[in-house]
Amino acid sequence: MDLTITAIETEQIRVPLVRTYRGSHYKMTHRSTIITRIHTAGGLVGEAYAGDEDAGLAEIDSIIHEEIAPKILGEDGSAIERLWEIARPATWDILRDRRLGLVATASIDLTLWDLYARSLSTPLHKLWGG
């Protein structure tokens, strides 16, 4: 199966909660995340979600498409560690919240693992030893 990365797609999701959850320093009225899909030349699509806040979702999306995607398009999707190293510089920008780069990198990493598990027809939890 050809795991050459041909496209990266993201979708920002915001879902209201039925009730408000409160902690000592916060309240949650909704859940937010970014869904990432990686498409391959062989037709497989990996999918994962990461993040859980409104703040920064647009910037995370931008980091994925403007900083990470151009570097990994055309690469072998099974080379997960190598692609993580390629994506990692997105975490180095000291002028922005480092967490945003970490979530963007995690989004790609999780999606690559899902893609790899699908290529082996193995559930991801089994691939990881569960």
Residues covered by each model-derived region:
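Structured beta-strand/loop patches that form or line metal/cofactor-binding pockets in enzymes
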Residues: 1-53
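Glycine-rich, flexible loop/turn motifs
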Residues: 13, 17, 76, 120-124
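Metal- or metallocofactor-binding catalytic centers and their adjacent structured scaffolds
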Residues: 39-120
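Catalytic pocket of metal/acid-base enzymes, prominently hydrolases
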Residues: 116-130
